[in-house]
A protein has these predicted regions:
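Alpha-solenoid helical repeat scaffolds
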Residues: 127, 166, 170-173, 179, ...
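An aromatic- and glycine-enriched ligand-binding surface/loop that stacks and positions planar moieties
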Residues: 26-88, 174, 199, 227-340
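Bacterial N-terminal signal peptides
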Residues: 12-20
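Second-shell loop/turn segments in exported
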Residues: 37-43, 99-107, 185-193, 224, ...
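Short coil/linker segments at helix-helix boundaries
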Residues: 131-146, 173-192, 248-268
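Bacterial N-terminal signal peptides that target proteins for export
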Residues: 2-12
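C-terminal motif of bacterial Sec signal peptides marking the signal peptidase cleavage site
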Residues: 22-24
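Conserved, well-structured interaction surfaces
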Residues: 50, 54-62, 84-171, 187-200, ...
């Protein structure tokens, strides 16, 4: 009896403690989740708005190995062969790809990028700069940030045009989306535009962007390298018009495959757009392979770049088979012989 009393008391006390803890947890677990950053909080903040645009840049094409991770794109051509038979890049060599299984199917990616760009364009003017506008000692910073917002808006328009072109390049005429769409609406009856409509939209956007953006990205500092510029907009226009001039990108419903016409005026427009880029006088072929990758992004060939962290992936994927070497890309003799 003496031993049972403390045990029973202990059980009762533990039960009371558990009830107390559970009742206390109720309030704790029911707390409102207040760390979510909504649209209002994003686009009234200069810093958060800047990050939102950076997120749109993430949808630009990845680098040389964007298909198959380890494979350079040349492995899908006659220039090279990838050593790994199961690598996705091999689908292009074997013909084992179709509309349902396409290693380069980027429909979802680029429309996601277009949505982000549209949302940015619609909201960037909401950024609150009163902290600097109302401070006489911060007028220079106020003007800098005001200019940033204008520049960013046209960078987003460039990205939207770029993403549309990437879709047109792969799928032909696609719906041109210039506003943020509701997820609840029915878009099944959305008409497919003509190729000329798509090309006209992208080309026109490039012209408007080129009127605003400078030849140097952002404020001209190293951290801005990779942002859209006037040169990038004109170069995109040149590329778009070049594709548009090809008989392969005509509106096929009006022509048979055996009788595809060639529109000389479109070729002239493409040539003039390319000359407009050349006449900027800031781009040229780089003369030395030895120093091509050694100048910290200062390269006369770069028009639009996507920056990556310092690593040895390129070497690792292409070193001969050994410890730390994959031996992935094997060039053809034809490619070797094409060099002088």
């Amino acid at each position: 009896i003496i031993m049972k009393y403390p045990i029973g008391l202990s059980i009762i006390l533990n039960a009371l403690a558990a009830i107390s803890i559970l009742s206390g947890c109720s309030d704790y677990l029911d707390r409102e989740y207040d760390s979510f950053i909504d649209n209002e909080m994003t686009f009234t903040s200069y810093e958060r708005t800047s990050k939102f645009l950076v997120n749109a840049y993430r949808y630009l094409p990845d680098g040389f190995n964007r298909i198959g991770s380890e494979a350079m794109l040349d492995a899908a051509t006659d220039d090279a062969e990838h050593a790994n038979a199961s690598c996705n890049i091999q689908h292009f060599n074997t013909g084992a790809w179709n509309s349902r299984s396409n290693p380069d199917d980027l429909w979802n990616k680029y429309y996601a990028g277009i949505r982000i760009a549209n949302e940015f364009i619609e909201n960037v003017d909401r950024v609150n700069l009163d902290k600097y506008r109302l401070d006489p000692d911060n007028q220079n910073e106020y003007q800098n940030r005001l200019n940033d917002l204008k520049t960013w808006k046209y960078e987003a328009r460039f990205l939207r045009a770029f993403f549309h072109f990437e879709l047109v390049k792969r799928f032909g005429p696609v719906p041109v989306i210039t506003s943020t769409l509701s997820v609840n609406a029915d878009y099944s009856e959305t008409p497919r535009p003509s190729m000329d409509d798509c090309i006209s939209f992208i080309s026109s956007e490039c012209d408007k962007v080129a009127e605003v953006l400078d030849l140097t990205p952002g404020r001209g500092i190293d951290s801005d390298l990779g942002r859209a510029t006037k040169g990038a907009a004109l170069a995109l226009k040149s590329r778009v018009l070049l594709y548009a001039a090809s008989p392969l990108y005509l509106d096929w419903q009006n022509f048979s495959e055996s009788d595809l016409p060639s529109d000389m005026e479109k070729w002239k427009a493409a040539a003039q757009a390319a000359k407009d880029v050349i006449d900027l006088g800031i781009y040229s072929l780089y003369g030395s392979y030895a120093t091509l990758f050694k100048n910290n992004f200062q390269n006369s060939e770069f028009i639009l770049m996507r920056r990556y962290g310092n690593n040895s992936d390129f070497e690792k994927y292409n070193f001969p088979v050994s410890y730390g070497g994959v031996g992935g890309i094997n060039t053809s003799l034809n490619l070797v012989d094409s060099y002088e």
